[in-house]
């Protein structure tokens, strides 16, 4: 058995309709362009903020979550953390992985700080109705049956950060003053 000829399928409306939630290539491309624009705008906004001091408790919480996740993954696969991060994670050493985990934790904390500061400085409030509406949309997007299941897995405050982030991105894209 061998591959004699490679054929790259043409992207068509039919393929898009069969493989995605979109009906046409244009719809798919338009939506993906919007998503990329949102990500780029948000990344630029967050990166423009300077953090003077990271709160230890929150940073440690996110750091520990990531470390514990990899420890559980290693245990599940019957390997050590060192094997897990070097063989499967692509890190040269456990110390490199720990440095990545700290950087990742700080990134998450910075993003939350930016969200809460921007929301507070701009008097942006999240009504219960808006929380439920956007929370349900996010729940579906992340593969949960409903908002209640999403809250059970992630907690209300994490969902609020996501909802506020989406609100802020819309304001930034809409060129509202933020």
Tell what function each PLM region has.
Residues 1-95, 106-178:
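Peptidyl-prolyl cis-trans isomerase
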């Amino acid at each position: 058995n061998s591959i004699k000829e490679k054929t790259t399928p043409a992207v068509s409306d039919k393929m898009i309709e069969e493989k995605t939630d979109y009906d046409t290539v244009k719809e798919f491309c338009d939506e993906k362009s919007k998503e990329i624009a949102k990500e780029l705008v948000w990344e630029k906004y967050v990166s423009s903020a300077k953090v003077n001091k990271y709160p230890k408790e929150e940073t440690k919480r996110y750091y520990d979550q990531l470390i514990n996740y990899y420890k559980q993954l290693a245990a599940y696969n019957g390997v050590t953390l060192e094997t897990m991060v070097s063989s499967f994670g692509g890190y040269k050493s456990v110390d490199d992985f720990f440095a990545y985990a700290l950087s990742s934790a700080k990134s998450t904390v910075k993003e939350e700080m930016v969200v809460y500061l921007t929301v507070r400085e701009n008097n942006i409030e999240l009504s219960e109705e808006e929380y439920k509406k956007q929370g349900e949309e996010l729940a579906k997007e992340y593969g949960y049956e409903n908002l209640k299941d999403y809250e059970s897995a992630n907690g209300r405050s994490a969902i609020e950060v996501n909802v506020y982030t989406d609100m802020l991105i819309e304001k930034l894209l809409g060129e509202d003053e933020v």
